[in-house]
């Protein structure tokens, strides 16, 4: 009877342990630290969609080929709420508790900068698809490049140059006003860089106005801008704020063209802004209208799965997944250090957003940009800008 009881107990334990075995135990675990809620949830949704599309397809083909053989990839997705402190906490949890070999995201610079600090200190590869602020890949103390942090996009100094030249040369603007969120890392950096670049190239900044995240009344700032009579208004702010600013500006009789940064790239800006944002221009990473054959396949696959074409965040995330996969293959191991070393040796990568070129010791790709116009309820390609 005792033997039977012991046998039953051991059998029960074995079944229990088997049932609790982690199905991803032998997989390559990649974390996602993204903005699924908060101020910019469309950004997180696009990033999640693209990563799942990429790795589901890779897994269907057998997974990533390492030295020990093929391995499936398991995504560990976490929401950072679009907040810097949560992004840092998620980074800590993904790396320390989930043992991910790499982390995709955060996307917003405000979240990517502190998360990058955690990734660097814990020696885990992080790639931000969409963070353009230079601080993301720089050590805060030494101002030297972080060894474990990379990005999938161009940086703000390049973007500022592109926008300033476009405003001066293509739009014929001589006077510009700037309105930006002073409490958010990316808009703050973009506003300052645009001001400096625009004036250095012969333009005049006639108003430099600020607001704080969550503000809904921009009448005081816009009244000052109206009095300054600019040719253009530069709004380096996220897609969720632009429609309200544009609406209030038009009601005040302001007719100047709006020019924006890559933070405008979600189609939500068209849904929310309507006629008030029609005719506006912004800098971006990707256009479905000038796609390569590889990009056309991505656009078709993404649209078929999600019912809408990909935005730039989706395309940049897809390319970030591709960079990680290429580095995993080259490194041959399911290890952070092998991945980092292989990723740091990539000098050129052709993705759906174009060609990436990396200088030795830098996690910032040298890439081209596009200028898009919001016209007739859609994003229309205007021109390319080369680095």
Write out the residue ranges for each language-model feature.
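Beta-alpha junction/loop-to-helix N-cap segments that form part of ligand/metal-binding clefts
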Residues: 21-23, 27, 42-47, 61-139, ...
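Extracytoplasmic "Venus flytrap"
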Residues: 31-52, 78-84, 107-110, 179-188, ...
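Short, polar/charged alpha-helical segment
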Residues: 43-66, 192-199
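Surface-exposed patches in mature extracellular/periplasmic domains of secreted proteins
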Residues: 63-68, 73, 105, 178-181, ...
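Extracellular/periplasmic periplasmic-binding protein-like sensory domains
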Residues: 246-318, 378-386
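Segments of small-molecule ligand-sensing domains
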Residues: 304-314, 325-381
């Amino acid at each position: 009877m005792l033997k039977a009881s012991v046998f039953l107990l051991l059998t029960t334990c074995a079944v229990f342990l088997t049932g609790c075995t982690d199905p991803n135990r032998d997989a390559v675990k990649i974390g996602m630290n993204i903005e699924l809620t908060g101020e910019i949830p469309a950004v997180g949704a696009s990033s999640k969609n693209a990563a799942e599309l990429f790795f589901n397809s890779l897994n269907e083909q057998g997974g990533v080929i390492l030295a020990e053989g093929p391995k499936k990839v398991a995504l560990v997705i976490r929401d950072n709420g679009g907040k810097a402190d949560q992004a840092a906490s998620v980074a800590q949890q993904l790396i320390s508790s989930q043992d991910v070999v790499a982390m995709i995201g955060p996307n917003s610079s405000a979240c990517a900068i502190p998360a990058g600090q955690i990734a660097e200190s814990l020696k885990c590869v992080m790639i931000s698809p969409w963070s353009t602020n230079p601080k993301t890949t720089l050590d805060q103390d030494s101002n030297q490049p972080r060894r474990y942090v990379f990005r999938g996009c161009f940086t703000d100094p390049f973007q500022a140059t592109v926008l300033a030249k476009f405003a001066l040369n293509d739009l014929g603007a001589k006077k510009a006003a700037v309105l930006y969120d002073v409490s958010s890392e990316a808009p703050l950096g973009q506003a300052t860089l645009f001001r400096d670049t625009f004036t250095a190239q012969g333009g005049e900044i006639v108003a430099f106005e600020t607001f704080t995240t969550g503000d809904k009344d921009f009448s005081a700032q816009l009244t000052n801008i109206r009095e300054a009579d600019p040719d253009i208004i530069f709004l380096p702010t996220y897609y969720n704020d632009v429609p309200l600013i544009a609406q209030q500006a038009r009601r005040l009789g302001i007719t100047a063209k709006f020019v924006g940064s890559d933070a405008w790239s979600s189609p939500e800006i068209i849904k929310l802004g309507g006629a008030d944002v029609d005719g506006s221009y912004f800098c971006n990473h990707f256009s479905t209208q000038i796609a390569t054959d590889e990009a056309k396949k991505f656009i078709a696959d993404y649209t078929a799965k999600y019912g809408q074409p990909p935005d730039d965040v989706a395309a940049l995330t897809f390319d970030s997944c591709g960079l990680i996969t290429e580095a995993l293959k080259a490194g041959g191991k399911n290890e952070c250090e092998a991945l980092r070393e292989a990723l740091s040796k990539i000098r050129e990568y052709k993705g759906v957003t174009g060609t990436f070129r990396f200088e030795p010791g830098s996690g910032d790709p040298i890439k081209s940009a596009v200028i898009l116009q919001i016209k007739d309820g859609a994003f229309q390609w205007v021109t390319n800008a080369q680095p």
